């Protein structure tokens, strides 16, 4: 494709020409896929809906075929989600079908939310901020939820879909929509995944911190971006929201043990095996709100390709296309924390980790620029981690690590 480096639009219509691509630190696009077809029909509530189907040339109507439902972000469209992900490319390789529905109104999904906080928060924000839909009745009654169920049924009637291998993935508001669907209608899914915009924790737990769930276990993938922020009406911190979203599905899926972790370039993985289902957390370094272009491929290769449900609705696992990229040797620390992650286990540091910032202030009129940030832990803890002998001099002001380091 021809990359339009001057584009500054959220969803440029120019992408429809089948030649243009865009490249941004939140969303990267592919050329508009030739097999992507638009459809319109009344699916529920006498409302005409729009969706886009992608059927790869390798589709065999004689074979049971997996289905992926991919949900676009707020103010986007189904075709926008198709070009901003690699789902169609993975479908070409694997032979499954992908459907990209449009939200019914304002390009925004009907979502559970605390409406009073939404109104109060948006009143404090300047600029042309679109208003969420006011939720009415129960989640199962939302048109976007009902029509998605009907769309899946329609796809099963039209194609030879494997009912045990239906998956959903979404980006941003589409991630929140996917999470909502997974919690209330997830019994028809084997797995769900999303990038950006985790769910407000107040929608996940009741007042006794019991999970709110009508669907039961299913395999879950959560992609989180380092430079992302949760919506302001959540009224909770970014890390708090991410932690509770992870905790929620760990409880539902019976993931009681410590995860196995893997670090690949700017991607940090935590793999959780559960008694009822598996969870994957992918943390992306130096990434803004959105989804990485290869997010779909990673979700399929490491998770969706290895989970399915039987006719009774019970979740099962087989070997995924790629084995989990677990590091046997790993070491991680966090600011102000006394615990360190060492070789997929936890050890206690002698004092908490702290960070020191290298700054430049000369010639900046009293301001400063952070040029580097460095983690510090006790040398004695390093000696313990790497099974080395610690030698100190000058009352501890000088320390040596003696002997060859041993890993594991």
Annotate each predicted stretch with a short phrase.
Residues 1-67, 93, 140, 144, ...:
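A domain-start/cap signature at the N-terminus of enzymes
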Residues 77-80, 107-111, 178, 201-206, ...:
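Extracytoplasmic/secreted cell-surface and envelope-processing proteins
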Residues 190-276:
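The feature captures the conserved acid-bearing segment of alpha/beta-hydrolase catalytic domains
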């Amino acid at each position: 494709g021809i990359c339009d480096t001057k584009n500054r639009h959220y969803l440029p219509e120019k992408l429809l020409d089948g030649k243009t691509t865009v490249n941004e630190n939140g969303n990267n696009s592919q050329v508009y896929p030739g097999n992507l077809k638009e459809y319109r029909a009344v699916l529920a509530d006498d409302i005409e809906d729009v969706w886009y189907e992608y059927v790869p040339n390798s589709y065999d109507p004689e074979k049971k075929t997996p289905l992926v439902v991919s949900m676009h972000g707020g103010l986007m469209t189904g075709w926008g989600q198709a070009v901003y992900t690699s789902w169609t490319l993975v479908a070409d390789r694997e032979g499954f079908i992908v459907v990209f529905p449009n939200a019914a109104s304002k390009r925004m999904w009907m979502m559970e939310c605390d409406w009073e906080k939404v109104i109060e928060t948006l009143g404090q924000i300047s600029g042309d901020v679109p208003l969420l839909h006011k939720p009415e009745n129960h989640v199962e009654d939302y048109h976007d939820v009902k029509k998605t169920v009907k769309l899946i049924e329609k796809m099963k009637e039209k194609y030879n879909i494997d009912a045990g291998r239906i998956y959903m993935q979404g980006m941003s508001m589409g991630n929140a929509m996917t999470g909502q669907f997974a919690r209330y209608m997830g019994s028809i899914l084997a797995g769900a995944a999303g990038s950006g915009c985790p769910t407000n924790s107040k929608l996940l737990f009741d007042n006794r911190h019991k999970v709110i769930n009508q669907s039961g276990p299913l395999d879950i993938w959560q992609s989180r971006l380092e430079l992302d922020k949760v919506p302001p009406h959540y009224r909770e911190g970014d890390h708090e929201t991410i932690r509770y979203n992870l905790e929620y599905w760990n409880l539902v899926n019976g993931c009681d043990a410590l995860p196995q972790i893997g670090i690949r370039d700017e991607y940090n993985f935590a793999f959780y095996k559960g008694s009822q289902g598996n969870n994957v957390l992918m943390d992306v370094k130096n990434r803004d709100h959105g989804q990485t272009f290869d997010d779909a491929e990673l979700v399929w290769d490491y998770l969706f390709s290895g989970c399915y449900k039987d006719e009774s609705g019970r979740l099962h696992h087989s070997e995924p296309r790629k084995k989990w990229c677990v590091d046997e040797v790993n070491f991680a620390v966090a600011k102000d924390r006394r615990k360190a992650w060492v070789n997929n286990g936890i050890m206690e540091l002698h004092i908490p980790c702290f960070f020191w910032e290298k700054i430049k202030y000369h010639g900046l009129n009293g301001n400063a620029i952070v040029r580097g940030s460095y983690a510090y832990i006790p040398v004695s803890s390093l000696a313990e981690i790497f099974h080395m002998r610690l030698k100190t001099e000058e009352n501890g002001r000088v320390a040596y690590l003696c002997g060859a380091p041993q890993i594991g």
